[in-house]
A protein has these predicted regions:
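Short, glycine-rich nucleotide/cofactor-binding loops
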Residues: 47-57
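Class I S-adenosyl-L-methionine
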Residues: 102-125
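Mid-chain, well-packed structural core segment of small domains
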Residues: 58-92, 97
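N-terminal, charge-rich interaction modules
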Residues: 1-28
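Short, charged/polar "capping" segments at the starts of alpha-helices
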Residues: 25-30, 84-86
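Positions that flank functional sites
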Residues: 22, 83, 113
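Short acidic low-complexity segments
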Residues: 35-44
Protein backbone atom coordinates (compact mmCIF):
# COMPACT_ATOMS: atom_id res chain seq x y z
CA UNK A 1 0.00 0.00 0.00
CA UNK A 2 1.36 3.41 -0.95
CA UNK A 3 1.88 5.89 1.85
CA UNK A 4 0.15 9.23 1.18
CA UNK A 5 2.49 12.18 0.84
CA UNK A 6 1.94 15.31 2.90
CA UNK A 7 0.85 17.09 -0.30
CA UNK A 8 -1.78 14.36 -0.87
CA UNK A 9 -3.05 14.72 2.70
CA UNK A 10 -3.34 18.48 2.17
CA UNK A 11 -5.51 18.01 -0.96
CA UNK A 12 -3.26 20.18 -3.13
CA UNK A 13 -4.37 18.65 -6.45
CA UNK A 14 -6.70 21.54 -7.28
CA UNK A 15 -4.57 24.36 -5.82
CA UNK A 16 -3.22 26.84 -8.33
CA UNK A 17 -1.01 28.77 -5.89
CA UNK A 18 0.71 28.05 -2.58
CA UNK A 19 2.69 30.21 -0.17
CA UNK A 20 4.91 28.74 2.55
CA UNK A 21 5.80 30.73 5.67
CA UNK A 22 8.57 29.78 8.11
CA UNK A 23 9.49 26.79 5.96
CA UNK A 24 12.94 26.55 7.50
CA UNK A 25 11.21 24.93 10.49
CA UNK A 26 10.73 21.75 8.42
CA UNK A 27 12.65 21.76 5.11
CA UNK A 28 11.81 18.09 4.55
CA UNK A 29 8.11 18.85 4.20
CA UNK A 30 8.73 21.97 2.13
CA UNK A 31 10.73 19.89 -0.37
CA UNK A 32 7.68 17.63 -0.89
CA UNK A 33 5.41 20.48 -1.97
CA UNK A 34 4.63 20.90 -5.70
CA UNK A 35 7.09 23.48 -7.06
CA UNK A 36 4.84 24.49 -9.96
CA UNK A 37 2.28 26.17 -7.68
CA UNK A 38 4.73 27.96 -5.34
CA UNK A 39 4.39 31.72 -5.02
CA UNK A 40 6.01 34.33 -2.81
CA UNK A 41 2.93 36.52 -2.42
CA UNK A 42 -0.82 36.29 -2.04
CA UNK A 43 -3.58 35.83 -2.59
CA UNK A 44 -2.87 32.09 -2.50
CA UNK A 45 -5.19 29.09 -2.68
CA UNK A 46 -3.14 27.43 0.05
CA UNK A 47 -0.93 28.95 2.73
CA UNK A 48 1.26 26.54 4.71
CA UNK A 49 2.63 28.11 7.86
CA UNK A 50 4.97 26.41 10.32
CA UNK A 51 4.74 27.41 13.99
CA UNK A 52 7.04 25.82 16.57
CA UNK A 53 5.62 27.94 19.40
CA UNK A 54 3.15 30.69 20.30
CA UNK A 55 5.60 33.43 19.36
CA UNK A 56 5.92 32.09 15.79
CA UNK A 57 2.14 31.57 15.59
CA UNK A 58 1.47 35.18 16.55
CA UNK A 59 4.19 36.48 14.22
CA UNK A 60 3.31 34.55 11.05
CA UNK A 61 -0.50 34.30 11.42
CA UNK A 62 -1.30 37.88 10.29
CA UNK A 63 0.98 37.42 7.26
CA UNK A 64 -0.73 34.11 6.43
CA UNK A 65 -4.21 35.58 6.83
CA UNK A 66 -3.36 38.52 4.58
CA UNK A 67 -1.97 36.19 1.88
CA UNK A 68 -4.89 33.76 2.00
CA UNK A 69 -7.36 33.90 -0.90
CA UNK A 70 -11.05 34.32 0.01
CA UNK A 71 -11.82 30.62 -0.48
CA UNK A 72 -8.31 29.40 0.35
CA UNK A 73 -7.06 26.99 2.98
CA UNK A 74 -4.59 27.91 5.69
CA UNK A 75 -2.57 24.99 6.99
CA UNK A 76 -0.75 25.54 10.27
CA UNK A 77 1.91 22.91 10.89
CA UNK A 78 2.78 22.64 14.57
CA UNK A 79 4.80 20.38 16.85
CA UNK A 80 2.90 17.60 18.57
CA UNK A 81 2.92 17.56 22.36
CA UNK A 82 4.83 14.26 22.10
CA UNK A 83 7.55 15.77 19.88
CA UNK A 84 11.14 15.71 21.04
CA UNK A 85 11.16 19.53 21.03
CA UNK A 86 9.13 21.49 23.57
CA UNK A 87 6.18 23.56 22.36
CA UNK A 88 3.61 25.80 24.01
CA UNK A 89 0.87 25.40 21.38
CA UNK A 90 -1.51 22.62 20.38
CA UNK A 91 -4.54 22.09 18.13
CA UNK A 92 -6.94 23.68 20.61
CA UNK A 93 -4.85 26.77 21.36
CA UNK A 94 -4.18 27.33 17.64
CA UNK A 95 -7.88 26.99 16.79
CA UNK A 96 -8.87 29.36 19.61
CA UNK A 97 -6.33 31.95 18.42
CA UNK A 98 -7.48 31.54 14.80
CA UNK A 99 -11.18 31.93 15.70
CA UNK A 100 -10.38 35.21 17.44
CA UNK A 101 -8.99 36.28 14.06
CA UNK A 102 -11.88 35.16 11.82
CA UNK A 103 -10.57 31.73 10.81
CA UNK A 104 -11.62 28.30 12.07
CA UNK A 105 -10.20 24.78 12.00
CA UNK A 106 -11.86 22.27 9.68
CA UNK A 107 -9.48 19.29 9.48
CA UNK A 108 -6.30 17.79 10.88
CA UNK A 109 -3.52 15.60 9.52
CA UNK A 110 -0.43 13.93 10.90
CA UNK A 111 2.60 15.17 8.98
CA UNK A 112 5.18 12.94 10.65
CA UNK A 113 6.18 11.69 14.11
CA UNK A 114 6.75 15.24 15.41
CA UNK A 115 4.41 17.46 13.39
CA UNK A 116 0.65 17.77 12.85
CA UNK A 117 -1.21 20.07 10.51
CA UNK A 118 -4.44 21.97 11.17
CA UNK A 119 -6.44 23.10 8.13
CA UNK A 120 -8.36 26.32 8.60
CA UNK A 121 -10.81 28.38 6.54
CA UNK A 122 -12.20 31.89 6.86
CA UNK A 123 -15.35 32.03 8.99
CA UNK A 124 -18.34 32.82 6.76
CA UNK A 125 -20.33 35.80 8.04
Amino acid sequence: MNEKTVADKMFLRTAKSMLILNGEAHPGVVSQMPKEIMTDKGPADVVLMFARNRKELEHFFPIAKEALGDKGSLWIAYLKQTASKATDINRDSINEFAKENGITGVAMISIDMDWSGLRLKRIEV
